[in-house]
């Protein structure tokens, strides 16, 4: 065996950008990363588009990034896969989707479309919603209601109005559908058990309770007038003659077209789980035909999944377990699922010999209020694990560049970058002390571009910029090759450990003899 432990450090949302304007990575004081990039083998890696199984030019994201890293191969994402099925026409024969249609026909009930209405491509894509309108039209379903969840994180903060406008035009063109509610993802797509937020969304959907507006566009505009951007639009019910256009009722069908699970779970559980305890449901549990685009959570009952995931076998974690090696995964709450569930190919169960260390994320409204988040605690746990000599491999994620980058607050993002730099320094020292080795990377860009260079507006989304690949304390005879992507990381780590990569991994090691 080689040096031990081998650490994979993921700096979430830490991209590289030649421009310094609006670039927290360039503006922060980062003596540690500067030194590593100057003195260690360092190249720029690809973390977006086809390199991670997304459509060309599509920004990467944390789920996709960790999936590719853990798989050691390019994993074609749901976005790419579903879009292809729409183009091929297979989409319109999908059994689960037709189950929703048949239920509406049988019970003369309504079809509700839930989902993040944007082209961000991280959680959903608006073209998938358009395909659902087309599906309803082809099957003669007339009562189709869109519940528009606004984005503003993976898209510009005030772009929601245009997405609603485009959706309304598409409904007009296809000849079916109307907007029934509008709400920000802050409420309906929480992932941190903030049930008070989810309850507001649920009550708008089921009771027609909340803010009211005469039309979808009016709902967005009245929020903008109160300085609420897309993400924070209060759940708003569209009313006609003083009554809600539509609410979700017993025997209706719901199709939730988000394909990424983490932020779809809570609201889905509120509808589908007969033993739900998050908050008091005004009407209690009632039966629906609820179709989830993907498997949000196997523990949520009473739903049907439309697109089952392609199994990924022999992930990096599985490979380590099969070789009897001990591994640790650690991160704070916001990214814990990424270093565990997503890194393991979408499998919840830990591998044999896989320990997990979760550090709670701070309970603040938005992370610009505490840009260091829980980085120092994650760092302390990591340093202790390195010194313990207990693990062969440790995988860690620092959430700050991404989570604080999403706020668009440049000053806070700079502080986040500086906090992470300090942590990287402590870990490098611990690695050298233990004679371990480390590979530093990022899963996608974010903090390196916080303004839209054309409009000069805040830019809160991920980017298509390259990310750093840095080799720390490995054999000096080696450097890194250019042109790699996230799928090449696991094969690199396996070679660093003196082992042979499994045939299922099609990525290629980045190590190159000088």
Which residues make up each language-model segment?
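Feature captures the catalytic ectodomains and active-site-proximal regions of enzymes
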Residues: 1-514
């Amino acid at each position: 065996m080689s040096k031990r432990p081998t650490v994979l450090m993921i700096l979430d949302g830490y991209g590289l950008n030649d421009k310094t304007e609006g670039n927290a990575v360039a503006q922060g004081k980062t003596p540690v990363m500067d030194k590593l990039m100057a003195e260690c083998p360092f190249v720029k890696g690809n973390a977006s588009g086809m390199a991670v199984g997304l459509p060309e030019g599509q920004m990467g994201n944390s789920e996709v990034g960790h999936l590719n890293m853990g798989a050691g191969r390019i994993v074609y994402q749901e976005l790419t896969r579903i879009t292809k099925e729409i183009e091929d026409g297979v989409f319109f024969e999908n059994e689960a989707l037709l189950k929703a249609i048949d239920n509406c026909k049988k019970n003369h009930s309504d079809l509700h479309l839930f989902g993040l209405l944007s082209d961000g491509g991280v959680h959903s894509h608006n073209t998938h919603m358009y395909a659902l309108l087309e599906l309803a039209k082809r099957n003669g379903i007339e009562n189709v209601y869109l519940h528009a969840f606004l984005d503003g994180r993976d898209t510009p903060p005030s772009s929601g109005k245009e997405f609603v406008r485009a959706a309304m035009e598409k409904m007009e063109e296809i000849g079916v559908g109307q907007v029934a509610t509008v709400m920000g993802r802050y409420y309906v797509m929480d992932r941190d058990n903030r049930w008070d937020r989810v309850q507001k969304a649920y009550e708008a959907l089921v009771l027609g309770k909340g803010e009211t507006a005469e039309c979808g566009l009016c709902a967005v505009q009245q929020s903008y007038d109160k300085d609420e951007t897309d993400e924070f639009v209060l759940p708003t019910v569209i009313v006609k003659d003083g009554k809600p256009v539509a609410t979700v009722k017993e025997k209706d069908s719901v199709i939730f077209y988000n394909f990424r699970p983490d932020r779809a779970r809570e609201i889905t559980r509120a509808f589908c789980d007969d033993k739900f305890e998050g908050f008091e449901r005004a009407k209690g549990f009632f039966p629906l035909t609820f179709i989830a685009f993907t498997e949000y959570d196997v523990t949520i009952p009473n739903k049907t999944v439309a697109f089952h995931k392609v199994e990924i076998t022999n992930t990096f974690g599985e490979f380590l377990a099969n070789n009897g090696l001990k591994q640790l995964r650690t991160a704070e709450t916001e990214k814990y699922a990424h270093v565990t569930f997503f890194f393991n190919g979408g499998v919840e169960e830990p591998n044999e010999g896989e320990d997990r260390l979760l550090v709670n994320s701070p309970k603040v409204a938005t992370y610009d209020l505490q840009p260091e988040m829980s980085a120092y605690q994650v760092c302390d746990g990591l340093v202790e694990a390195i010194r313990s000599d207990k693990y062969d491999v440790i995988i860690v994620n620092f959430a700050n560049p991404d989570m604080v980058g999403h706020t668009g607050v440049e000053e806070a993002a700079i502080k986040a970058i500086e906090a992470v730099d300090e942590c990287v320094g402590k870990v490098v020292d611990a690695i050298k002390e233990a004679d371990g080795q480390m590979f530093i990377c990022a899963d996608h860009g974010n903090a390196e571009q916080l303004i839209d260079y054309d409009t000069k507006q805040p830019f809160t989304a991920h980017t298509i910029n390259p990310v750093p690949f840095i080799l720390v304390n490995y054999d000096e005879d080696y450097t890194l090759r250019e042109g790699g992507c996230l799928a090449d990381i696991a094969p690199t780590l396996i070679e660093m450990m003196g082992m042979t990569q499994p045939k299922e991994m099609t990525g290629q090691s980045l190590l190159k003899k000088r």
